[in-house]
Curated annotation (Swiss-Prot):
One of its GO terms (cellular component) is cytoplasm. This is tRNA-specific 2-thiouridylase MnmA. Pfam families: tRNA_Me_trans, tRNA_Me_trans_C, tRNA_Me_trans_M. It comes from the Bacteria. ATP binds at residues 9-16, 35, 124. The gene is mnmA. Its EC number is 2.8.1.13. Residues 95-97 are annotated as: Interaction with target base in tRNA. It is found in: Cytoplasm. Keywords: ATP-binding, Cytoplasm, Disulfide bond, Nucleotide-binding, RNA-binding, Transferase, tRNA processing, tRNA-binding. SUPFAM superfamilies: Adenine nucleotide alpha hydrolases-like. The keyword tRNA-binding applies. The record marks 125, 347 as: Interaction with tRNA.
């Protein structure tokens, strides 16, 4: 009987290596595919592509599978990195890993795998796929501490129908145990924590290679200038480290946080105290929407939402009829039961019904506890969405 062929995305890490081994043990015809998605010739200090490829080959030899490398650097720069820079230039904070999954790992990679005769693909992500009544659902991993469905919420029915996540039902600690037991050469390799395919280099230095510094005033909510920023693109909502302000600037002793950006005046607004009302939001509007099932929840539906990775699901009410829809495509709004901290434009708002990931969108704006005297641009995005 002909074995089902599965192409496994192998990064050189423990998770994808164990994924390949598990599928081989289950009787699949496994091919490993290593993706090079960044031209790192000038970045040897931070990119680990060469060592990662060596690890992939070593693992493939050990478990007895064929492996090949494919270069998606052009696709990555066109579909992911260009958008990444556009968002930062506009003062937002994008999540390139979300777009990388949708456009590279589960599009360019999937297409290439099909050309190799694969019936399905597999990756080392911690998530699950379930077929129910002819539809495919994306579910959280059993190990919620490692769940990665947040990064996968833009996958559609066609992509999920050809995807397996073998680690979705296995705790991370067990994956490490398996790697050690079968003697994987990378069993003790650290997990990657850098931006998708760009590595773990100092982020501000990296961004400065592509975006110019544009210094401007750093002000408090009452308009007092307390410092100078190097460029709005280099700061994100809720940021504490790297602002360059000491807690004693006005005598309160509390730490400073980035609270707003006024693009028109190139002003960065900062506040003191983690619980400052400018850092709390009860409502958000999101666009660039994607639904796993191809359709949104019903208006008024109760769901849980994450506005950042590893955040607990926050209870909220959903509405798909966000005013301003005609001007900018499909949008939705969420009203939370409790104020959420540092809801950041550019990040993803991902919706859940229990363990089922429904999909989500890119946060355009959030209504905070800012008073009426707040800078106009702080509310303009939300007003426009309305």
């Amino acid at each position: 009987m002909t074995k089902r062929r599965v192409v496994v995305g192998m990064s050189g890490g423990v998770d994808s290596s164990v994924t390949a081994w598990l599928l081989k043990e289950q009787g699949y015809d496994v091919i490993g595919l290593f993706m090079k998605n960044w031209e790192d010739d000038d970045d040897g200090e931070y990119c680990s592509t060469r060592q990662d490829w060596i690890d992939v080959v070593s693992v493939a030899d050990l478990i007895g599978i064929d492996v090949e490398a494919v270069n998606f650097a052009a696709e990555y720069k066109d579909r992911v990195f260009a958008e990444f820079l556009r968002e930062y230039s506009a003062g937002r904070t994008p999540n390139p890993d979300v777009l990388c999954n949708a456009e590279i790992k589960f599009k360019a990679f999937l297409d290439h795998a099909m050309s190799l005769g694969a019936e399905t693909i597999a990756t080392g992500h911690y998530a699950r796929v379930r077929e129910r009544d002819g539809r495919f659902e994306l579910l959280k991993a059993f190990d919620h501490t490692k769940d990665q469905s947040y990064f996968l919420h833009r996958l559609n029915q066609a992509q999920l129908s050809k995807t397996m996540f073998p680690l979705g039902e296995i705790p991370k600690t067990k994956v490490r145990e398996i790697a050690a037991q079968i003697g994987l050469p990378n069993a003790k390799k650290k997990d990657s924590t850098g931006i998708c395919f760009i590595g773990e280099r100092p982020f501000r230095d990296f961004l400065n290679r592509y975006l110019p510094t544009q210094p401007g005033p750093m002000k408090t909510p009452d308009g007092k200038t307390v410092g100078e920023h190097i460029g709005l693109a280099f700061y994100t909502f809720g940021q504490r480290k790297g602002i360059g302000l000491g807690g004693s600037k006005d005598g309160s002793g509390e730490p400073w946080f980035v609270a707003a950006k006024d693009i028109a005046s190139n002003t960065l607004y900062v506040v003191q105290g983690h619980d400052h009302p400018w850092l709390r939001s009860r409502e958000l509007v999101a666009g660039n929407v994607s639904w796993v099932a191809g359709e949104p929840p019903s208006d008024g539906a109760r769901c849980g939402a994450k506005t950042r990775y590893r955040q607990a699901d926050a209870p909220c009410a959903f509405s798909s009829a966000a005013p301003g829809e005609a001007a900018g495509g499909e949008r939705f709004s969420l009203v939370f039961d409790e104020p959420q901290w540092a809801v950041t434009p550019g990040q993803s708002a991902v919706l859940y019904d229990g363990d089922v990931c429904l999909g989500g969108g890119i946060i355009e704006a959030a209504a905070t506890g800012r008073p009426d005297a707040a800078p106009a641009s702080c509310e303009s995005a939300l007003a426009e969405a309305r």
